[in-house]
From Swiss-Prot:
Signal peptide from the UniProt entry: 1-22
Motif (LPXTG sorting signal): 504-508
Record gene name: tee6
Designated name of the protein: Trypsin-resistant surface T6 protein
Keyword Secreted set for record: yes
Keywords: Cell wall, Peptidoglycan-anchor, Secreted, Signal
Segments for region (Hydrophilic): 310-330
GO cellular component: extracellular region
Membrane topology listed for this record: Peptidoglycan-anchor
Compartment(s): Secreted, Cell wall
The keyword Signal appears for this protein: yes
Residues found modified as Pentaglycyl murein peptidoglycan amidated threonine: T507
Length: 537
C-alpha cells in the first residue's frame, strides 16, 4: 500500500473515487492541455497484483526491464522506460490508443495500473516528452489518479524539463530598403541575417536530442561563411578551423560550410536549455532574380518531436530528413531587386542605336553602373534598389553627337511594371583604374572576386577598389512587355535621342525653323560680302 501511495503522490490529483477494492475497480486517467493534435498511445508497464479473491491489492508488478522509484519516479527513469519501449527491449503488458477531446486525452483504467504515455506527430511540431500515469489506491481504499498537465514540468529528477515544448525559429534580415512591405536590395549589397530559437525540452536520458540548423542561399545570394557568428549566454563563440563552436572551454556545436550555406549541429546537453543566436551575411550577386518572384532564403531548424525514438542527428554533410523522430520548423525571407531600362534612338528616324554607353548615378551623383545599348537600342542596369537614379550618356554611338541631357528615373514596386526576357547583364570588374571603361570612377569594392556596392565595403585588408572594365550588352532578342506592378523592370517612358554628326537637332518647332532661316541668311550674307571684296581686289 505504501508503494501505491508513493506513486499516487506523483500522479495523484483530481481524485476519482470508487466504492470497492477490486481488480475491476476503474479510474479515469487524463492528460490535459494537449495541443497540436498528436497521437496519444498508452503503454501499460505496471499492473496491480491482487489476492486470489481479487478483493485485496498486494503490490505492482512491472514489465521486464522496467526500473522505477516508487517513492518519486524521476524524469530520467520515465525516459529510459520509453526508450526501452521504442527499441523493443521492454514489452508492455498492453497498448492503447487514446482519442483527444477538447485538448484532453481520457482513458478508463481498470484496476491498479501504471502507464507510459507517448504523444507523437503533433501537427504544430510540438515535442512531447514521455508522461507517467498511474491508477492507485489511497489510504481509504479508493482507486484514484491525477490529471496530468502536458505543459507541466517533471516533479522528480530534471524538474526544469517540461513535459511538452513548442520549438520555433525566427529569421530576420537587415540591410534592405522597405518598399510596399517588400524588402528590396541591389546588386553588391550586403544582407545581414539573424536566427533566434525556442529550443525543445529533452530529458537527460533522451536518445534523440537533435538540434540542427541548415541554411542554403538561393542562387542570387552569395553566402559568406566567415561572417557566421554564434552568441550564447551573452558571449560570442569562437568557430575553430574544424568547425567546433566554442564558448570559452565549452563546445556547444559544430558548423560546416555546405554549398552556398551552412549546416550547424548543436550539442543539446551543452546548451543548458539556453537558446543560441546565429547571425551571418550574404552579398547580392548578378544572378539575383528581378521582380515579384524575388530571392528567397530559407532557414530550417531540425529537432526531435519524439525524443525516445531514433538517434541524435549530427551529420554536417547532409541535413536530416524528416521522420524517425525528427521534424523541422522553417522561416524564410525574400529580398527583391529591380532593374531600370531605357531605349536609345535616332532623333529623326527613331531607329534604335547600338553602342551608346551610359552611366547610371544615384541621387548623390555617385556612379553605380555603366551600360551599353544593344542592336535594339536597349540598355539595362541591375545595380539599383528602390529609389531615384540619373542616366547620363558617356559615349555617343558612332556617327552621332553626345546627348548631354540628364534623365531621371524612379525604381520602386509601383513603377516596376515591365517584364523583360533579360534578368541580368554581364559585367567585368577590375581593381586597376587604368583598365576602367572610359576612365570611369570607382563603382564599388572587390574582395575574393566578389563585387560589393560602394556603400557596402567589406572588412579586411584584402579589399580593393572596383571599376567597371567592360559590360556585355543585352542580347538582340531581348523583349520588353507591359505587365503588373512588381514585375521588376522600370522602363524610362521616353526614348533617349541622338543627333547625327553634321545634323542640327529638329523637333519640328517654329523656333527650330527660325534658327535654320537665320543661319541660312547669315551664310548667304557672308558669301555676298566675300564676292564684293574679290571684285574690289
Amino acid at each position: 500500500m505504501l508503494a501505491c501511495l508513493a506513486i499516487l503522490a506523483v500522479v495523484g490529483l483530481g481524485m476519482t473515487r470508487v466504492s470497492a477494492l477490486s481488480k475491476d475497480d476503474t479510474a479515469q486517467l487524463k492528460i490535459t492541455n494537449i495541443e497540436g493534435g498528436p497521437t496519444v498511445t498508452l503503454y501499460k508497464i505496471g499492473e496491480g497484483v491482487y489476492n486470489t479473491n481479487g478483493d485485496s491489492f498486494i503490490n505492482f508488478k512491472y514489465a521486464e526491464g522496467v526500473s522505477l522509484t516508487e517513492t518519486g519516479p524521476t524524469s530520467q527513469e520515465i525516459t529510459t522506460i520509453a526508450n526501452g519501449i521504442n527499441t523493443g527491449k521492454i514489452k508492455p503488458f498492453s497498448t492503447e490508443n487514446v482519442s483527444i477531446s477538447n485538448g484532453t486525452a481520457t482513458y478508463n483504467a481498470r484496476g491498479a495500473s501504471v502507464y507510459i504515455a507517448l504523444l507523437t506527430g503533433a501537427t504544430d511540431g510540438r515535442t512531447y516528452n514521455p508522461i507517467l500515469l498511474a491508477a492507485s489506491y489511497n489510504g481509504e481504499g479508493n482507486l484514484v489518479t491525477k490529471n496530468i498537465d502536458s505543459k507541466s514540468n517533471y516533479l522528480y529528477g530534471q524538474t526544469s524539463v517540461a513535459k511538452s515544448s513548442l520549438p520555433s525559429i525566427t529569421k530576420k534580415v537587415t540591410g534592405t530598403i522597405d518598399d510596399v512591405n517588400k524588402k528590396t536590395t541591389s546588386l553588391g549589397s550586403v544582407l545581414s541575417y539573424s536566427l533566434t530559437f525556442e529550443l525543445p525540452s529533452y530529458t537527460k536520458e533522451a536518445v534523440n536530442k537533435t538540434v540542427y540548423v541548415s541554411d542554403n542561399m538561393s542562387e542570387g545570394l552569395t553566402f559568406n561563411f566567415n561572417s557566421l557568428t554564434v552568441e550564447w549566454k551573452g558571449k560570442m563563440a569562437n568557430i575553430t578551423e574544424d568547425g567546433s563552436v566554442m564558448v570559452e572551454n565549452t563546445k556547444i556545436g559544430i558548423a560546416k560550410e555546405v554549398n552556398n550555406g551552412f549546416n550547424l549541429s548543436f550539442i543539446y546537453d551543452s546548451l543548458e536549455s539556453i537558446s543560441p543566436n546565429i547571425s551571418y551575411k550574404a552579398v547580392v550577386n548578378n544572378k539575383a532574380i528581378v521582380g515579384e518572384e524575388g530571392n528567397p532564403n530559407k532557414a530550417e531548424f531540425f529537432y526531435s518531436n519524439n525524443p525516445t525514438k531514433g538517434n541524435t542527428y549530427d551529420n554536417l554533410d547532409k541535413k536530416p530528413d524528416k521522420g524517425n523522430g525528427i521534424t523541422s520548423k522553417e522561416d524564410s525571407k525574400i529580398v527583391y531587386t529591380y532593374q531600370i531600362a531605357f531605349r536609345k534612338v535616332d532623333s529623326v528616324s527613331k531607329t534604335p542605336l547600338i553602342g551608346a554607353i551610359f552611366g547610371v548615378y544615384d541621387t548623390s551623383n555617385k556612379l553605380i553602373d555603366i551600360v551599353t545599348t544593344n542592336k535594339n537600342g536597349y540598355a539595362i542596369s541591375t545595380q539599383v534598389s528602390s529609389g531615384k537614379y540619373k542616366i547620363k550618356e558617356l559615349k555617343a554611338p558612332k556617327g552621332y553627337s553626345l546627348n548631354t541631357e540628364t534623365y531621371e528615373i524612379t525604381a520602386n514596386w509601383v513603377t516596376a511594371t515591365v517584364k523583360t526576357s533579360a534578368n541580368s547583364k554581364s559585367t567585368t570588374y577590375t581593381s586597376d583604374k587604368n583598365k576602367a571603361t572610359d576612365n570611369s570612377e570607382q563603382v564599388g569594392w572587390l574582395k575574393n572576386g566578389i563585387f560589393y556596392s560602394i556603400d557596402s565595403r567589406p572588412t579586411g585588408n584584402d579589399v580593393k577598389e572596383a571599376y567597371i572594365e567592360s559590360t556585355k550588352a543585352l542580347t538582340d532578342g531581348t523583349t520588353f512587355s507591359k505587365s503588373n506592378e512588381g514585375s521588376g523592370t522600370v522602363l524610362l517612358e521616353t526614348d533617349i535621342p541622338n543627333t547625327k554628326l553634321g545634323e542640327l537637332p529638329s523637333t519640328g518647332s517654329i523656333g527650330t525653323y527660325l534658327f535654320k532661316a537665320i543661319g541660312s541668311a547669315a551664310m548667304i550674307g557672308a558669301i555676298g560680302i566675300y564676292i564684293v571684296k574679290r571684285r574690289k581686289a
